[in-house]
Amino acid sequence: ATGSPAPDCVESFQSWRYTDVRNGCSDAVTVVVQYE
């Protein structure tokens, strides 16, 4: 993955099926993960 780290209020975690991202910020935040 490339780019700057997501803000602390954005939590990401991996389950056995998929990677889930939860936005805990008061403002909308777009998180983009690129696999190369």
UniProtKB/Swiss-Prot annotation:
SUPFAM superfamilies in the cross-refs: alpha-Amylase inhibitor tendamistat
Molecular function via GO: alpha-amylase inhibitor activity
UniProt-listed InterPro entries: A-amylase_inhib, A-amylase_inhib_sf
Keyword Nuclease: no
Keywords carried by this UniProt record: Alpha-amylase inhibitor, Disulfide bond
Presence of the UniProt keyword Disulfide bond in the record: yes
Cysteine-cysteine disulfides: 9-25
Miscellaneous comment in the UniProt entry for this protein: This protein is an effective inhibitor of pancreatic alpha-amylase. It is 5 times less effective against human salivary amylase.
Function noted in UniProt: Inhibits mammalian alpha-amylases specifically but has no action on plant and microbial alpha-amylases.
Protein's name in the database: Alpha-amylase inhibitor AI-3688
Species in which this protein is naturally found: Kitasatospora aureofaciens (Streptomyces aureofaciens)
